[in-house]
């Protein structure tokens, strides 16, 4: 899995420079996990058409490799232009919870809604190892009057039912699990490494 960087890291700026300087945490057969330094995890949504004001993405890239994914282009901001690199190079925002604790103030949010997982799946395989999403939920469980929505294709979300309940006691929380098709063969073609439709339906029953 070669990275197609064409310029030295010293000439890159912003997120591209951070991506080039990222340390490799783990190399798997089909993906590489890298640590990504970030200054902020709360991103304001500029579109009035969206039902949320803020977004949080615990990772950059997504190992599920959905063929129709609209977020693949975001890797281009880091100088990664090959289609497959979105699922091959997964950037881990390991310090995200500490940063969110600083950013998550009543004055800033004022009851506004947060969408978790708009450009990545917050429960992709990396989450089992690094638990960035769980650490973010732990921070949000301490807040009040949030509007949190989570979108995922993974049954791993059921692991965090304890934190989702805590958040629900103080705020509004909604979990959406995408089930594109019940045809397992077609799902494997469209959503290469995502959990099977049966596992997702079972997660919905559990929730």
What are the residue ranges of the model-derived segments?
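Polybasic, low-complexity association/targeting segments
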Residues: 1-26
């Amino acid at each position: 899995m070669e990275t197609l960087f064409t310029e030295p890291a010293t000439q890159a700026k912003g997120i591209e420079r951070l991506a080039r300087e990222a340390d490799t945490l783990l190399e798997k057969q089909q993906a590489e996990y890298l640590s990504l330094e970030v200054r902020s995890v709360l991103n304001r949504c500029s579109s009035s058409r969206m039902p949320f004001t803020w977004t949080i993405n615990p990772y950059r890239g997504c190992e599920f490799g959905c063929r129709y994914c609209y977020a693949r282009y975001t890797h281009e901001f880091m100088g990664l232009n090959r289609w497959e690199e979105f699922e091959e190079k997964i950037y881990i925002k390991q310090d995200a919870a500490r940063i969110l604790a600083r950013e998550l103030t009543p004055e800033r949010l004022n009851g506004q809604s947060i969408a978790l997982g708009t450009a990545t799946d917050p429960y992709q395989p990396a989450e089992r190892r690094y638990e960035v999403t769980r650490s973010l939920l732990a921070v949000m469980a301490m807040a009040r009057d949030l509007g949190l929505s989570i979108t995922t294709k993974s049954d791993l979300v059921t692991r965090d039912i304890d934190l989702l309940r805590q958040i629900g006691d103080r705020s509004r929380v909604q979990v959406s699990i995408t089930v594109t098709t019940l045809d397992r063969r077609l799902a494997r073609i469209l959503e290469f490494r995502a959990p099977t439709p049966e596992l997702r339906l079972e997660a919905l029953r559990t929730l």
